[in-house]
Amino acid sequence: MSKKTKQELENNKLSKRLRHAVGDTINDFNMIEPGDKIMVCLSGGKDSYALLDILRRLQASAPIDFELVAVNLDQKQPGFPEEVLPTYLESIGVPYKIVEEDTYSTVKRVLDEGKTTCSLCSRLRRGILYRTAKELGCTKIALGHHRDDILATMFLNMFYGGKLKAMPPKLVSDNGEHIVIRPLAYVKEKDLIKYAELKQFPIIPCNLCGSQPNLQRQVIGDMLRDWDKRFPGRIESMFSALQNVVPSHLADTELFDFAGLERGQNLKHGGDLAFDSEKMPERFSDGSEEDESEIKIEPQKAERKVINILANKPKTCGA
């Protein structure tokens, strides 16, 4: 096999792996429903480019119809290349809106020089994006956070916030008006890096604002990358833990009624038997040799029909 052919096979496997990971996430959390208009938040980074690209490919083959509109927030950062995103989006034929809001000046005015601006900037950006989604009539807001982001947030909250809390793949905004989805929740960052190189997305640097990097998040990110190199499977196991929570074996009295425990009571996850070692779920083994057949999912609720986004569009007569 030639080097070129081998690389083509690897690229094809990567594309299929990402498509299945995003499709599984959408299916598991019922992220996309018939008739949805999804606002894809596009920053110009590798993650949001990949998100839009994969959603477009799923849109073309999915058994349901939904719309995509890309939205970028131009925060008037010095040196921001205003022409890059419109040129790219027009070249691929995706409807888009560029929202111009000078949050850069606001943040610089409020915070001291050299301080990390990410937190305040994020809050301002969120409010503007929510408003834009309402103006456009969008039913869902899609963000480009991936599996590594979710785990990093969990450790940040544990180490610095004293909370066992991560970043949900799907949430309702505090005012109840918006559904936010993260279709890349099952996707590895290293796969997104490879995909961005493969697709040659016109990446816009994320440090144009001149803000100091979030040191805490940087330390957590380095820790996760180090673990991934030294202990294969650890990242997958940790993410699996977020999907297999056992409240009766934690210490939150609001999640579980410890005070009401009585003899003879049978717990869903067992009492002392829950300490026995468990096997890691097979779906979190290395995905490089992933089965290309469509992944079946069990309905979460009997009354709700789950649509498999990975299924093909139904054929029409004469097709």
Swiss-Prot record:
Lineage of producing organism: Bacteria, Pseudomonadati, Pseudomonadota, Betaproteobacteria, Neisseriales
Chief location category: cytoplasm
Cofactor dependency: Mg(2+); [4Fe-4S] cluster
Coiled coil: none
Binding partners and assembly: Homodimer.
Remarks, miscellaneous: The thiolation reaction likely consists of two steps: a first activation step by ATP to form an adenylated intermediate of the target base of tRNA, and a second nucleophilic substitution step of the sulfur (S) atom supplied by the hydrosulfide attached to the Fe-S cluster.
One GO term (biological process): tRNA thio-modification
Catalytic activity: cytidine(32) in tRNA + S-sulfanyl-L-cysteinyl-[cysteine desulfurase] + AH2 + ATP = 2-thiocytidine(32) in tRNA + L-cysteinyl-[cysteine desulfurase] + A + AMP + diphosphate + H(+)
Name this protein carries in UniProt: tRNA-cytidine(32) 2-sulfurtransferase
Annotated family: Belongs to the TtcA family.
Enzyme Commission number(s): 2.8.1.-
GO cellular component annotations of the record: cytoplasm
Binding site for [4Fe-4S] cluster: 118, 121, 209
GO molecular function annotations of the record: 4 iron, 4 sulfur cluster binding; ATP binding; magnesium ion binding; sulfurtransferase activity; tRNA binding
Subcellular location: Cytoplasm
Record key words, sorted: 4Fe-4S, ATP-binding, Cytoplasm, Iron, Iron-sulfur, Magnesium, Metal-binding, Nucleotide-binding, RNA-binding, Transferase, tRNA processing, tRNA-binding
Function: Catalyzes the ATP-dependent 2-thiolation of cytidine in position 32 of tRNA, to form 2-thiocytidine (s(2)C32). The sulfur atoms are provided by the cysteine/cysteine desulfurase (IscS) system.
UniProt remark on cofactor binding: Binds 1 [4Fe-4S] cluster per subunit. The cluster is chelated by three Cys residues, the fourth Fe has a free coordination site that may bind a sulfur atom transferred from the persulfide of IscS.
Organism encoding this protein: Neisseria gonorrhoeae (strain NCCP11945)
Pathway listed: tRNA modification
Record-annotated membrane-spanning stretches: none
Gene3D superfamilies per UniProt: HUPs
Gene: ttcA
UniProt motif PP-loop motif: location: 43-48
